[in-house]
Amino acid sequence: MSAAPAYSEDKGGSAGPGEPEYGHDPASGGIFSSDYKRHDDLKEMLDTNKDSLKLEAMKRIVAMIARGKNASDLFPAVVKNVACKNIEVKKLVYVYLVRYAEEQQDLALLSISTFQRGLKDPNQLIRASALRVLSSIRVPIIVPIMMLAIKEAASDMSPYVRKTAAHAIPKLYSLDSDQKDQLIEVIEKLLADKTTLVAGSVVMAFEEVCPERIDLIHKNYRKLCNLLIDVEEWGQVVIISMLTRYARTQFLSPTQNESLLEENAEKAFYGSEEDEAKGAGSEETAAAAAPSRKPYVMDPDHRLLLRNTKPLLQSRSAAVVMAVAQLYFHLAPKAEVGVIAKALVRLLRSHSEVQYVVLQNVATMSIKRRGMFEPYLKSFYIRSTDPTQIKILKLEVLTNLANETNIPTVLREFQTYIRSMDKDFVAATIQAIGRCATNIGRVRDTCLNGLVQLLSNRDELVVAESVVVIKKLLQMQPAQHGEIIKHLAKLTDNIQVPMARASILWLIGEYCEHVPRIAPDVLRKMAKSFTAEEDIVKLQVINLAAKLYLTNSKQTKLLTQYVLSLAKYDQNYDIRDRARFTRQLIVPSEQGGALSRHAKKLFLAPKPAPVLESSFKDRDHFQLGSLSHLLNAKATGYQELPDWPEEAPDPSVRNVEVPEWTKCSNREKRKEKEKPFYSDSEGESGPTESADSDPESESESDSKSSSESGSGESSSESDNEDQDEDEEKGRGSESEQSEEDGKRKTKKKVPERKGEASSSDEGSDSSSSSSESEMTSESEEEQLEPASWSRKTPPSSKSAPATKEISLLDLEDFTPPSVQPVSPPAIVSTSLAADLEGLTLTDSTLVPSLLSPVSGVGRQELLHRVAGEGLAVDYTFSRQPFSGDPHMVSVHIHFSNSSDTPIKGLHVGTPKLPAGISIQEFPEIESLAPGESATAVMGINFCDSTQAANFQLCTQTRQFYVSIQPPVGELMAPVFMSENEFKKEQGKLMGMNEITEKLMLPDTCRSDHIVVQKVTATANLGRVPCGTSDEYRFAGRTLTGGSLVLLTLDARPAGAAQLTVNSEKMVIGTMLVKDVIQALTQ
């Protein structure tokens, strides 16, 4: 083979006779040269049938990428091997594709079906890599495929794949922000995941997509706090940052009553005699004010957060320590914030980059919490090896920590720093001395004298900076320092730094009455060199001339006119403008303007002394540790730190409902005894529980790998509550283990609720607070009624296994509505027709029932009676044509009022619908009396997609946000055709329009009756006559687009079968195959 010689040549060898030998790196193999023949050899190696050659080629290609070489021209040859059976080759192919898929989008799109198959690979690394490649293809046309892949991966048994799904969410959101509602549902589902591997990634996705949806965190707050210690380091940083913002909105400020407590303590210690002398009136006033000042009691969840983050101060990661430090600074009481000082000081031994960030934050903290870092003053002393930016930041911290006790030590340090060779550092030190003199009055004279001594320094920059600082200090006590002003005036001949010269001129002009003889002479010298001065100096010369003209016009009138004449023709616009303005103001014209009379007040008005403040003073409004705080400017994507609430929000929103869990488990155990058919199939637990299931449930987990959910329905709140409570209580006792078994069997039977029906009330805080007590007060008889209803509805329960895939994600509430439902007659009759369909002996007898709708799913909850404050709402897909529009899915909405008051004005509010989806609202229900039920019909055009229809269910007083998401089988209508027509249409839909999967039918699903029932319950398809007894054909069309959907099931002996779906809509075909296989294999 032609590739073999090149392959051995790459390994290196000796040169031929008479040729010089060249040494080369055997690792490179000559691959990294610009010789295109090398790449041709790699392409040949990738085209061979030998996995060993392919593996070697991929290793070299990945090595090229690692060394920064361009390997994009190999994309066609590499992408062909994505379907290679060798797992090691496939891994490296995906590594390559993740790197180049975004650059070679057109070629990547050609292999998109292969990537989709990779999502179902048994190896979790391949599934995750396939999802990473899909999310790297930044083409809007594949958004539906990406959404489907993310939903499937979110239900994957592997935590690593679910983590990758969380990473893909922000990528899809940045590509198409219209998918936000569906992505929020996936985020809500992943937030309920108990796996530490997923927690950080999903919180990052939450922060990117919907940081305002703080209600998604309520039920998962305690779980996140408890998992925090075990999450990977970057995940800890993200979670802590998010929980900081969450806590600022849900808890009261721990420092709100500190001033009041200090006043009371001082009063109790000193003012006992004064209190006795006070009149009764003052006592009454104090008594009236007392109820409004309640003592602060920390919320237990607030304490939980502080307690669980404190150990992370010992983390090896500087980012984690910094995150905990900012959390304590923003959330902890003053008495507890001090624990972060030692951890931050420890970080100062790290790299200079880490020191820079830490010192930025310490500088901000030390302004408000000076006492926190005072014991560690020596840790901020400057080393000669420190970079300049580190020195300046340490200087900032030392200045902030200076007080009357430690100022002698600090000033001695500053004296040493002034001798440094780093001029920027010396200038910052002089500024720091000026700030110390401003803040501590008793050392002001000492600092001023030291700065005056620096005026004789040989370094002009040191002298210039000293002049600027002296100018600011002299403004505080100008009358006492006339000699210093004279000394500065003498320096005008020597100092050439513009800022220093400008400062001296300003001082002389401002306090010219203290140096009446020197000031005119300085003006004379400056007039000589006016044209050669910098602009900032020229402006101060004009100011000096104006002030001297107003105070000593006899000596300076001509000089002032000369300076103004020079300035009038200066090149700088500002100087010319200032000269004209000043001339009109100080030199009276013939008319005598009104401003001229007040010129002295304008120029010689007393000015307040400048306040020397830290540049970090106003940075504390940014969240510490953020990029915005580092830059002192709001960065893109920065989330503002919320203000503390004035009143404590309802803490019960973070509670979990235990009673509902217990009752549900017991009821499902009773149902299991009555229905052994369902106990044969292995129970499925939610995707979040599979990661940490018991060893005893391994077989159960294995069965789940063939039926991973991809419907994208979000986990409900009650499931989140159950998981969190289960985590807190543990699983030690036998009773708890039995509850765990009940939970799995419960989730096995939930499939009756196939489509998604999530509801969130605007007043979720208040409704959830009463949910626990309401559920606890319900009697056992009330709980048995829904169970009996479930048993009395054969069509729903029989079709349940066919919908189990969707129900994995829809565990919002295990308790069906308490009101006895009345099924529409049409549903019952069609279900009976479906039952009879499997009993026919000839194909001709199938024709009358082919087009009759079959009830696929039972009632599904739209609004729980607790969240709806007594209003319970369910819905069913009736599979009957909607009278208003044949393209719409007919949905029956069932209302029930379990409250004590009538509910008035039931109607649909403003819908929030994705593009293409429309709703035909049901007529308004004027009133629903207590205990009564009502049914309405509405139509929804899902536009041949499984995107949820989100809308508001409104009454006269409340609005409830609800969502209906259809299973893929409800998006089509049955079609009648002959066998020949079926084969003809199937021949047109081959290639990429055909999806084939093999499966093994269980013993309970090998009769014609069961097979037909399960398929028609899963999808609204019509049966097509077939000449053979071991083959089943079904046909239908999508409601909106009218696209043909053909399904063929070829059953073989011993239970082996092959399922084929032909449809031009690949996404619908893929989802339908998955649903039907799951229904048939249960």
From Swiss-Prot:
Report any one BP term from Gene Ontology: clathrin-coated vesicle cargo loading, AP-3-mediated
**Bias-annotated ranges (Basic and acidic residues):** 666-677
Tissues where this protein is expressed: Isoform 1 expression is specific to nervous system. Expressed in nerve terminal and cell body, and is associated with nerve-terminal vesicles. Expression seen in Purkinje cells, cortical neurons, neuroectodermal tumors and graded in cerebral cortex (deeper layers exhibit stronger expression). Isoform 2 is expressed at high levels in brain and testis.
**What GO CC terms are in its UniProt record?**
AP-3 adaptor complex; axon cytoplasm; clathrin-coated vesicle membrane; early endosome; Golgi apparatus; intracellular vesicle; presynapse
Q: Which gene encodes it?
A: AP3B2
Q: Residue ranges under compositional bias (Polar residues)?
A: 790-800
What's the disease link here? Answer: Developmental and epileptic encephalopathy 48: A form of epileptic encephalopathy, a heterogeneous group of severe early-onset epilepsies characterized by refractory seizures, neurodevelopmental impairment, and poor prognosis. Development is normal prior to seizure onset, after which cognitive and motor delays become apparent. DEE48 is an autosomal recessive form characterized by onset of seizures in the first year of life. Affected individuals manifest global developmental delay, intellectual disability, absent speech, and poor, if any, motor development.
The record, for Pfam families, names: Adaptin_N, AP3B1_C, AP3B1_C_2
| Free-text function comment from the UniProt entry | Subunit of non-clathrin- and clathrin-associated adaptor protein complex 3 (AP-3) that plays a role in protein sorting in the late-Golgi/trans-Golgi network (TGN) and/or endosomes. The AP complexes mediate both the recruitment of clathrin to membranes and the recognition of sorting signals within the cytosolic tails of transmembrane cargo molecules. AP-3 appears to be involved in the sorting of a subset of transmembrane proteins targeted to lysosomes and lysosome-related organelles.
The name on file for this protein is AP-3 complex subunit beta-2
UniProt keyword list? Cytoplasmic vesicle, Epilepsy, Golgi apparatus, Membrane, Phosphoprotein, Protein transport, Transport
Q: Which family does it belong to?
A: Belongs to the adaptor complexes large subunit family.
Compositionally biased, Acidic residues: which spans? 691-700, 716-727, 775-784
Q: Where in the cell is it found?
A: Cytoplasmic vesicle, Clathrin-coated vesicle membrane; Golgi apparatus
Q: Does the keyword Membrane apply?
A: yes
Q: Which residues form a coiled coil?
A: none
Q: Which SUPFAM superfamilies does this entry report, sorted A to Z? A: ARM repeat (SSF48371), Clathrin adaptor appendage domain (SSF49348)
Organism name: Homo sapiens (Human)
Q: How does it sit in the membrane?
A: Peripheral membrane protein
Q: Modified residue Phosphoserine is at which positions?
A: S272, S282
User: Whom does it interact with, and what assembly results?
Assistant: AP-3 associates with the BLOC-1 complex. Adaptor protein complex 3 (AP-3) is a heterotetramer composed of two large adaptins (delta-type subunit AP3D1 and beta-type subunit AP3B1 or AP3B2), a medium adaptin (mu-type subunit AP3M1 or AP3M2) and a small adaptin (sigma-type subunit APS1 or AP3S2).
